């Protein structure tokens, strides 16, 4: 019952399949251009299944649209969000190392890194010797506790089991279930309402404010209304935008806050499934300890100035990868196939050859006609309109993918790898599971949906702080940016409430 959820290969395991929706109950439409909308509707949401990589956007990203003459300018810069990145880092716990690179900025509260293994350190040294464009191999910066503890439900250090997709009973990686929800519950001010399908924001024509939300209980199919002074949408880009689109009134016949006509447009993702892997002869007397849930990261090294600028494409990409020396397993050698008893046991626990591989995440530009719409003729089991997607990558992304593939292989070649295999799968929108941009931030209400504090321009007591708000995508995993923007917006909302402005 998950034909679309299983398209990416990310949702194939018995231990994690329940974290993703039943496609028959939650249909969507991608007949024109295939779109992989991978999601789950449960308490904790994607915080249970995210990849946990946390890389900041910088002014290289925030200024890119303006400099390139693409779409519209971001209404914020790094200095506006940097304190809130710090706030989130300190709260959730992020491990990694500082490198002194402006577009891969140092962070105040990094926990001790998992560490690079001997082959990864060899690759790091090789990069510094063989490339003059500033590229480095660093520790992946991921939201895992590696020392001490963090706020939440008794969070402790990572046990190096690498079973994160099952949900971590130790709370070692950040999830809302292990961290923010317990902290919110402890205040005594949280009421959690699971099985609630929010489908509309209630707009008050007299006060010109939102006054609540309408929801359907997925268990009994009854409708309920809840009221509040401030409403935050943070249910992932597509879901939040869908709620805004369904929130129609005399003032907003085309969806709440959609004066600009941009709601649902400028849909972005990160394109990936491009990379290379290879085999390394050497370090045969070395192996690894435990099962790290994170490997290495190669920050962006294209179009960052000077000789790194490319003539075939703008923006850039980064790589995520790992080197390992797994065990032989069953039937990985001729001797295994003919052995039995003690000899077989001896063989299968011998470490295999060293291998390494990395895949790239690249930026997709904000094209206006990459969009989502609602289809009221095709409804789900709760009578709500389904989402129709129409989005493709263009020439800039195709040129970038060619370079991503070439550089992935070249880095392994210069590091002494053999039997190098480079690949590029056909990209389908949504494969990155980083969809964003459908209710973008901007200076001008005529060209954007949200202002610099993530408020809907024309309904100031509604905030949208998930991927929908993004004005460009960068190439970095975006969740840490959503968290920082959410914390910043929540602080702003408290100030505005105290001033009685909303």
Question: Regions from the language model: what does each represent?
Answer:
Residues 1, 170, 187, 196, ...:
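Glycine-rich loop(s) and the adjacent beta-strand/alpha-helix scaffold that form part
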Residues 2-22, 26-36, 41, 51-56, ...:
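Conserved redox-cofactor binding core of oxidoreductases
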Residues 6-7, 16-17, 21-24, 33, ...:
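A glycine-rich dinucleotide-binding beta-alpha-beta segment and adjacent secondary-structure elements
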Residues 21-39, 43-46, 50-51, 56, ...:
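FAD cofactor-binding and catalytic pocket of flavoenzymes
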Residues 51-52, 61, 65, 149-151, ...:
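Short, solvent-exposed loop/turn and secondary-structure capping segments
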Residues 70, 173, 221-224, 229, ...:
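Alpha-helix N-cap/helix-initiation motif
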Residues 76-87, 262, 403-407, 488:
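A non-catalytic, amphipathic alpha-helix used as a structural packing/dimerization or gating element
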Residues 472-493:
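A conserved FAD-binding loop/helix module that cradles the flavin
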């Amino acid at each position: 019952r998950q034909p679309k959820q299983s398209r990416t290969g990310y949702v194939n395991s018995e231990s994690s399949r329940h974290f993703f929706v039943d496609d028959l109950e939650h249909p969507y439409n991608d007949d024109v251009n295939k779109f992989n909308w991978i999601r789950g509707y449960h308490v904790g949401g994607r915080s249970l299944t995210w990849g946990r990589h946390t890389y900041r956007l910088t002014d290289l990203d925030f200024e890119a649209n303006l400099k390139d003459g693409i779409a519209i300018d971001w209404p914020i810069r790094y200095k506006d969000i940097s304190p809130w990145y710090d706030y989130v880092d300190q709260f959730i716990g992020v491990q990694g190392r500082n490198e002194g690179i402006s577009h891969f900025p140092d962070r105040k509260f990094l926990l001790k890194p998992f560490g690079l293994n001997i082959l990864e350190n060899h690759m790091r040294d090789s990069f510094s010797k063989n490339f003059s464009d500033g590229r480095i191999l660093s520790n992946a910066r991921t939201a895992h506790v590696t020392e001490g503890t963090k706020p939440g439900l008794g969070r402790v250090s990572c046990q190096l089991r690498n079973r994160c997709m099952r949900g971590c009973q130790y709370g070692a990686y950040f999830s809302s279930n292990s961290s923010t929800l317990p902290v919110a519950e402890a205040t005594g001010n949280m009421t959690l309402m699971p099985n609630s399908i929010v489908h509309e924001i209630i707009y008050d024509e007299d006060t010109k404010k939102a006054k609540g939300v309408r929801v359907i209980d997925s268990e009994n199919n009854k409708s309920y209304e809840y009221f509040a002074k401030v409403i935050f949408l943070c249910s992932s880009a597509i879901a939040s935008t869908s709620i805004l689109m369904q929130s129609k009134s005399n003032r907003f016949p085309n969806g709440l806050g959609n004066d600009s006509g941009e709601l649902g447009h400028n849909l972005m993702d990160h394109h990936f499934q491009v990379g290379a892997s290879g085999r390394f002869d050497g370090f045969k007397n070395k192996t690894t300890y435990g099962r790290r849930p994170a490997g290495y990261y190669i920050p962006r090294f294209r179009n960052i100035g000077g000789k790194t600028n490319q003539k075939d494409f703008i923006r850039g990409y980064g790589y995520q990868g790992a080197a390992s020396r797994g065990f032989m397993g069953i039937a990985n050698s001729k001797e295994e196939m003919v052995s039995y008893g003690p000899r077989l046991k001896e063989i299968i626990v011998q470490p295999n050859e060293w291998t390494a591989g990395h895949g790239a995440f690249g930026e997709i530009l904000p094209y206006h006609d990459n969009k989502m719409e609602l289809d009221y003729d095709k409804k789900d089991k709760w009578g709500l309109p389904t989402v129709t997607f129409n989005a493709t990558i263009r020439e800039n992304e195709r040129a970038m993918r060619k370079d991503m593939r070439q550089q992935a292989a070249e880095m392994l070649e210069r590091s002494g790898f053999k039997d190098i295999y480079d690949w590029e799968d056909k990209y389908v929108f949504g494969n990155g599971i980083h969809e964003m941009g459908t209710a973008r931030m901007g200076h001008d209400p005529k060209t954007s949906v949200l202002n610099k504090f993530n408020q809907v321009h024309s309904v100031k007591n509604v905030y949208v702080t998930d991927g929908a708000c993004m004005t460009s995508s960068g190439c970095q995993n975006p969740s840490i940016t959503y968290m920082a923007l959410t914390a910043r917006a929540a602080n702003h909302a408290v100030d505005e409430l105290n001033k009685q402005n909303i």
